[in-house]
């Protein structure tokens, strides 16, 4: 596959949001989970990442599809599909609800959480794609703040990022 790259600038002035880009990446992970999926962000809220209010994603969820899917649910579903999910965030109470929900919903041997007080990077990275930029995975980051987010599929960027992330924080095994 030829590498593809798209940078978007989100915020109230642009009227652009990152929702569809993030949803597409997570749906791809539902279908074919990466061996390792990395989420790195100092601030994480259990944001809704898929709106299934009109049933567009019913086939992904089985017999009782939810109206929506939160980030912790999406990552847990991906971990149940075989991915080892790595989360690097700050050890701040703000991130607590998200982390508790993720740990409760995912198989324990498929989740690796690192808390780093100095983390400032914002990245979501699978086997052959990476989403990175200035956006925290929070309501403000996704819907209110002016942000710059780049999505790259194919090429060497994701592989290099996964190597760098594993070197910095290990793989939790």
Q: Which functions belong to the PLM regions below?
A:
Residues 1-173:
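PLD/PLD-like phosphodiesterase catalytic module centered on the HKD motif
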